[in-house]
């Protein structure tokens, strides 16, 4: 069964010119890029995307970071796309939890600047895709 997930290449990934490497890894995993867009993120979109973190101490810095420079937003499709991309991304903390061979393990430096976002469930994927790609 084909599944869809939202993938974001965050500002640090775009600024460090890792977009091609990350997309290549997604495709080599056997996943397909169904939609791809470079965009500047508004504070409104960022607030909606990260709504579950509102009120947490890091919320303001998270919004500041994600709106600081362009991101690449993509709809990624394939069998078990959500779990497959999360495995490819690696643990959220790129130093302590992401293993070598993952995007974060190979390129990440800090927890906040961890290069990519991938939906964590089918429900999140549906909500996030609707936010980032309303006509999809």
Curated annotation (Swiss-Prot):
GO terms for molecular function: ATP binding; metal ion binding; nucleoside diphosphate kinase activity. The active site is at residue 117. ATP binds at residues 10, 58, 86, 92, 104, 114. Its main location: cytoplasm. Its cofactor is Mg(2+). SUPFAM superfamilies: Nucleoside diphosphate kinase, NDK. It is found in: Cytoplasm. It comes from the Bacteria. Keywords: ATP-binding, Cytoplasm, Kinase, Magnesium, Metal-binding, Nucleotide metabolism, Nucleotide-binding, Phosphoprotein, Transferase. PROSITE patterns: NDPK_LIKE (PS51374). PANTHER family: NUCLEOSIDE DIPHOSPHATE KINASE. Major role in the synthesis of nucleoside triphosphates other than ATP. The ATP gamma phosphate is transferred to the NDP beta phosphate via a ping-pong mechanism, using a phosphorylated active-site intermediate. Belongs to the NDK family. This is Nucleoside diphosphate kinase. It comes from Mycobacterium marinum (strain ATCC BAA-535 / M). The gene is ndk.
């Amino acid at each position: 069964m084909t599944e869809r997930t939202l993938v974001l290449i965050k500002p640090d990934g775009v600024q460090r010119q890792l977009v091609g490497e990350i997309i290549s890894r997604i495709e080599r995993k056997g996943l397909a890029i169904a939609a791809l867009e470079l965009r500047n993120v508004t504070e409104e979109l960022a607030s909606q995307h990260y709504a579950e973190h509102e009120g947490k101490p890091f919320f303001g810095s998270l919004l500041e970071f994600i709106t600081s420079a362009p991101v690449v937003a993509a709809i990624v499709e394939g069998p078990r796309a959500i779990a497959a991309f999360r495995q490819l991304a690696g643990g959220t903390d790129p130093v302590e939890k992401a293993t070598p061979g993952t995007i974060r393990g190979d390129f990440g430096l800090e927890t906040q600047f961890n290069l990519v976002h991938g939906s964590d469930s089918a429900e999140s994927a549906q909500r996030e895709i609707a936010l980032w790609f309303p006509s999809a």
